[in-house]
């Protein structure tokens, strides 16, 4: 069996919340994989994030103008504003950026047998003997991640990962930063208990081969950033009896045909060794 049980979890810790993702695969069929994810990261939108959503000053004013019928002179997404703090004065909600994991799926897996180590046993005596041996070797399990463009999102939350592959005796955990690419590894011994006994005639040789299944699994995690709150609007000469307005950012995005969300993809590749076993064969055997 290629993989008995695999758990992948990640979460970030901030005052607003965090991410949790659990991946559980049993057996070979990808359709049997169960992937659960929860959590979010919420923060008032930063100035450098506006470009990601196409809501820099010009396009935002144009979109607000389509909502009201007249392009405003000033528009804000968060406090402070001119002429006092309109968000506090009128109890308006600043525009916040919410980031959530919206999907995770296995996009590939591979398994192939590989020779981890081998050892020659030869009877150099003049009589038949029984030889007992054990063979083991250290191998490296790895986890590596890559990100698509993070689109300038200012996410300060830390990402805490935990990977567990029971069949491969793999358990890797670490804390990282949003958008950071890195590789983590652990060394484990395979074949420690793989003992064997063989009877050799005088001058006879055998080769003990420690083999294992080298496996890899690729998981794509998709995060989506959306906006909520209202745009604070000012008309210097007033408009329809008022100077100040609050337009919901969703309405502005829809009316102005602006980008409604930003998606970021993280690709995680897990590499491990499992199903180790020893084969004792004639020294000159090809397989």
UniProtKB/Swiss-Prot annotation:
Gene3D superfamilies referenced in this protein's UniProt entry, alphabetically: Proaerolysin, chain A, domain 3
Transmembrane segments: none
Tissue spec: Expressed by the venom apparatus.
Signal peptide: 1-17
Molecular function terms, GO-annotated: toxin activity
Primary location group: secreted
GO CC annotation terms, alphabetical: extracellular region
Subcellular location per the Swiss-Prot or TrEMBL entry: Secreted
Entry keywords, A to Z: Disulfide bond, Secreted, Signal, Toxin
Keyword flag Cell cycle: no
Processing and modification events after translation: Contains 2 disulfide bonds.
Annotated family: Belongs to the caterpillar 8 family.
Function noted in UniProt: Probable toxin.
Designated name of the protein: U-megalopygitoxin(8)-Mc8
High-level lineage: Eukaryota, Metazoa, Ecdysozoa, Arthropoda, Hexapoda
């Amino acid at each position: 069996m290629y993989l008995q049980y695999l758990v992948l979890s990640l979460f970030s810790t901030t005052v607003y919340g965090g991410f949790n993702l659990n991946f559980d695969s049993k057996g070979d069929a990808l359709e049997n994989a169960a992937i659960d994810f929860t959590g979010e990261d919420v923060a008032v939108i930063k100035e450098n994030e506006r470009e990601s959503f196409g809501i820099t000053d010009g396009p935002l004013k144009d979109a607000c103008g389509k909502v009201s019928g007249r392009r405003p002179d000033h528009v804000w997404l968060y406090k402070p504003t001119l002429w006092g703090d309109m968000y506090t004065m009128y109890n308006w909600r600043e525009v916040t950026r919410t980031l959530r994991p919206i999907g995770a799926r296995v996009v590939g897996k591979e398994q192939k047998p590989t020779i981890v180590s081998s050892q020659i046993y030869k009877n150099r005596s003049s009589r038949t003997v029984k030889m007992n041996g054990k063979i083991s070797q250290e191998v490296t399990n790895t986890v590596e991640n890559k990100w698509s463009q993070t689109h300038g999102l200012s996410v300060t939350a830390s990402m805490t990962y935990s990977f567990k592959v029971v069949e491969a005796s793999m358990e890797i955990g670490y804390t990282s930063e949003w958008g950071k690419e890195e590789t983590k590894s652990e060394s484990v011994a395979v074949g420690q208990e793989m003992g064997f006994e063989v009877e050799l005639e005088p001058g006879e040789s055998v080769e003990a081969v420690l083999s294992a299944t080298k496996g890899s699994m690729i998981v794509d995690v998709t995060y989506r950033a959306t906006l909520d709150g209202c745009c604070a609007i000012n008309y210097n000469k007033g408009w329809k009896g008022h100077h100040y307005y609050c337009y919901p950012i969703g309405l502005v995005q829809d009316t102005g045909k602006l980008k409604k969300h930003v998606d970021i993809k993280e690709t995680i590749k897990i590499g491990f060794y499992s199903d180790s076993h020893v084969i004792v064969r004639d020294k000159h055997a090809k397989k």
